[in-house]
Structures are given as structure tokens and as C-alpha cells.
Amino acid sequence: MTIAVVGAGMVGRSTALALALRGERVVLVDPMGDRSAASWGNAGHIATEQVAPLASPAMVRSVPRRLFALGGPLDLPPRQIAAWLPFAVRLLAASTPARFAAGSAVLRTLLAQAMPAWRRLVATIGAPELLREDGHFVAWPTGDSAATGLAAWQAADTGTARVDAASEQDLARLRILSPGIAGAIRFSGSGQVSDLDHLAAAMEGALSAAGVAIVRGTAVLGRDGAGMVIRGIAADRIVIAAGIGSRALMAAAGHRVPLIAERGYHIRGSADRWPHDLSPVVFEEHAMIVTRYADRVQIAGFVELGRADAPPDPRKWARLERHVRDLDLPVAGPFRRWMGARPTLPDYLPAIGGSTRADNLFYAFGHQHLGLTLAPITGELVADLLSGTAPAINLAPLAVERF
């Protein structure tokens, strides 16, 4: 039996590898082929603390002050209203206290398994140095904002992660980077992938060693009786793990999935005086996260809802560069600019399961900001599902039929 996994971001690669290691014959279909998926441009943050779905009463109340036009990170481009308005209506419906509580319970369970799954993955691919488990920082520019932020995070459900006030030693290190930092907190139990390029190469090597065939090109799905087929590829079972491209692929089987492109932006500059061993730093009032990769430092942020194929907005990159100057960060240009589309569903939960419309179709997509974090555990869950093993987590709340 041959299983085709469509999508070569971290969710797709993790799924293909997990299946191959269980003895399955696997073909990985890479529709992009250029590492342009969100997996390869994110902050590298293993975000075990992000238990609360962004579809929440608090988020809805905060929308006006978060708008990009007012200096915030959230952009709802007027020319793309046809793309984001239906999504926004569904998000509002998913933001009731009851649905938020249910979603938090699901994410808490998934995120509790994220770090153990990452440990297993880096051991499997022979690259344990890729996983750093030394937490991350959140910093603020005033004492009042730091006190408010610390209180909010200490009252929040952070799952298996723990939050404490940053030590004086930590603050001294952070102030070398940005003298205006007035206060900060330090998370433990979260982590970082130290180098996304190294991760991509290590995954390709592991896939090859496991016998996975990688096919570059677009997957075209069609109906074949009670199941689905991919044009030009002989596969008995198909897993859709194509990020934002999953919406069109699922539509071929009759699923109408309200998946939207939640686009993020980053800039990368030379590391200069940024320490090699410093954990990622979130500047919460600027809604950005700063991560060192090898000799580069990446600054990432923004939530732009709209079409995946819309031209990038240069104002986002310009604002990130302005934040670097305003915070006096030791990151030197010229900056490399990148934009990618996070695949997001209105309740901010992923979709993982088996199709009710095609007997041989399975799916794993919609991980929003948590694609990198949840990729290894998602791959294991899908492998459980296809091998007939009861998944360690109840997947019913993640079925696409919830929409």
C-alpha cells in the first residue's frame, strides 16, 4: 500500500516520516519546492504556552486597538474584504466563552505533547542540537506595562510552560540589546528550533533514509468511486497537509473548509552583537518576536487576513525595520524581507482526521501560529490514525465537520 502526503512544510514532512518509520510506503508531494511555506520563515518558537485560542472574547474586544492603521499588528485589508469577512463572522461565533473554553482544552492537550514529540523527532533525524529547551522572554518598555504583563501571564493558562519575573541577570542581558527595556518575564518549558534551514535539510535526509519518495509539483485530486486519486501518482491513501493550499484540495472531495491565509512578515539582518545563546525575545507592545538563527537575527510579526496570493504589503517590513531602530536593537541591515501565509481556521484549532466524504482521504492542516510547534505530534497522530492504532489524543474536536 502506498500513502501520498501532499504538502512539504513541517506538518507534511513530519507526517510522511512518521508513516515511513511504521513501515508504510510513502510518497511526499511538494507543491512549492522552494521552502516558501510558513514552516520555513517563522520565528522557530516552540510555543507550548499558547494554550488560549486567539478566537476568544478578549481578542474580539481588543480588535480596535490592534488594527494596523492604528499602529497595531492586525490588518484587515479593505480590498480583500471578500476573503476575510466570512472568516471574521465565523471567528466571532467561535469566540463565545463556552467555545473558547472547549478550544483551550483541546489545545492544552495537544501542546502538552508537543515538546516530547519534538524530542523524539530530533533524535530520529539525528539532529538533537536543533531543539533548544531554554524558554523565551517577553519584554516591555515601561514598569507599568511590565507589571501588567506579568500579572496577565501569571493569571493565564500556559499549559506545561511556566512564567516567572526575569532575574536581574536576565534583565541586564536584555538591556544590553535594548536599553529601553523596563521589565521582562521568562518562560520555561517552551523552546526554539535553532536553525530552520538545518531542520529542512535534516528532515530531507531522514525522509530519504526512510525510503520516502519526494515528488515536486502540484497535486491534482479527482474522484474515483468512494475515494480520491492524485493525477499521475499511484496512491491507496492520501493525506492533505498542504497548509493554505489544503482548502482547494479538500474542496475536490466536497469539503468546504473556511481556511484563510493569516499572513506574517519577517526581516532578517546580521547578528552583530546579538548573543548566540539568547532565547527568543517577544517585544509585546510591538507585537514582534526576535530570534537568532546562525549569523542572522530575524524579527517577525503581523496578522494580515486575506488572500494567499495578494501582493505583500511593504509597509509591514518598513514598520519592523522602524521597530528595530526605535528599540535600538543590535541588528544590522541590509534586511532580507519575507512574507508567508499561516493556514488558519476560525476557531484557531487545527484540522486533523479522516474524511467522511472520501474513504481514503485524511488531513492535517490549519495549525495557524502553531504549525512548527505541533508538527511532530501531528505526524504521530496521523500515523496512528492510518495504522489503525488509537490516537493518543481524541481527534473528534478537530474534524472538519465542525464547520
List the model feature ranges, each with a label.
Residues 139-144, 164-173, 261-262, 270, ...:
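Flavin (FAD/FMN) cofactor-binding core of flavoprotein oxidoreductases
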Residues 167-174, 192, 213-229:
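A conserved short coil-to-beta-strand element within the FAD-binding core of flavoproteins
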